[in-house]
Design a protein with these regions (language model features):
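HhH-family (HhH-GPD) DNA N-glycosylase catalytic core used in base-excision repair
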Residues: 1-344
């Protein structure tokens, strides 16, 4: 990442060092020289001067089922927060940097002929560019290896779609909110409820895109919101209680919802919240933690996609059925959901 930032952007070397995870410029220079046998300034001086705003290039292993990924996000996109436009995804983002909230935007454009995603981020996110790029890789599942996953998905009772990916997130808390509000309702109904949260509690942000004007409300904002105000958005009392318990735990640092967080401990912490069962915890682990073996065994959609008879519709039976799909059961979930959402 550091080498690409030096050659493809005009970020100062000090910011590149921070983005690459180094606390000091001296340590960054030493590590860079040890690996490449020259210092960062030499690399930038010898390369061509990059134009302002040039995109960073993130590679992925083909095949990549872009239609499925983009379709998944398009069906769930929130007005003012995100936009799916052809092969391009745009959305707003709010992060913490040195105890301060930092807001901005990210634009990701698929370039299939190069097996790359070209990413641009707002200047406000420059100090966090390394973190942003890692979040983008998770969001679009760019590190997946189809050579390992597709042979397992070929065992599913549906046609293989090469290059299935897990649709991740830039904000794990947002995904958890979506999943809670998606309990026992359709995708469209869940999106409507989440949109109302954005409309009521979203935070304005400046972007060059007319469609992007707000960031998703923070955990702190929803934790301290008046429950009656949240309920008036059409969210039932049980969901309000679950939502605010989640927000309180995340705001307090008791639950971390990001790739690399401990799966079992996070599942236990989620299931301990009021109104959160195993289905919710598993779907959050699938999207927020990028757990490749997440398995929401009680999901009615999975049972429908698998064509299970009435006497076969129990979690134990479907879990036994899914045993050959380990350790990629989450990819099987996404593949089966795709068929449900896109009937032929």
């Amino acid at each position: 990442l550091a080498k690409q930032l030096l050659t493809d952007t005009q970020q100062p070397v000090t910011q590149v060092a921070l983005a690459a995870g180094f606390a000091s410029l001296r340590r960054f220079n030493a590590a860079f020289a040890e690996r490449y046998r020259f210092n960062p300034t030499q690399l930038r001086r010898e390369g061509a001067a990059p134009p302002p705003g040039q995109a960073l290039r993130l590679a992925y292993r083909p095949p990549y089922d872009m239609d499925a990924v983009l379709g998944f996000f398009a069906r769930r996109q929130l007005l003012r927060v995100e936009q799916v436009d052809g092969l391009t995804l745009r959305r707003t983002l709010a992060l913490q940097h040195k105890g301060q909230a930092v807001s901005g935007w990210v634009e990701c454009c698929f370039v299939p002929e190069r097996h790359e995603v070209h990413v641009q981020a707002s200047p406000t996110l420059s100090p966090l560019l390394g973190e942003v790029m890692q979040r983008v890789r998770h969001w679009l599942d760019l590190d997946a290896d189809p050579a390992l996953i597709d042979p397992v998905l070929a065992k599913l009772p549906v046609p293989l779609r090469p290059g299935t990916r897990l649709p991740g997130t830039l904000d794990g808390f947002e995904v958890a909110v979506r999943v809670i509000l998606g309990q026992q309702v359709t995708v469209q109904a869940a999106r409507t409820l989440v949109q109302r949260l954005v409309d009521r509690f979203g935070v304005p942000v400046d972007t060059p895109f007319p469609a992007l004007t707000h960031t998703f409300p923070s955990a702190q904002t929803l934790a301290t919101a008046d429950p009656e105000v949240v309920g008036k958005l059409g969210i039932v009392r049980q969901r309000v209680k679950a939502l605010q318990a989640l927000a309180t735990a995340v705001a307090a640092g008791q639950i971390a919802l990001h790739r690399g967080a401990p799966v079992e401990a996070t599942l236990d912490a989620l299931r301990a919240l009021p109104g959160v069962g195993d289905w919710t915890a598993q779907v959050v682990a699938l999207r927020a933690l990028a757990w490749p073996d997440a398995w929401p065994a009680s999901d009615i959609g999975l049972m429908n996609a698998l064509g299970l008879a009435k006497d076969q519709r129990d979690a134990r039976h479907i879990t036994t059925l899914a045993e050959p799909w380990r350790p990629w059961r989450a990819y099987a979930v996404i593949r089966l959901w795709h068929d449900l959402e896109n009937p032929t």
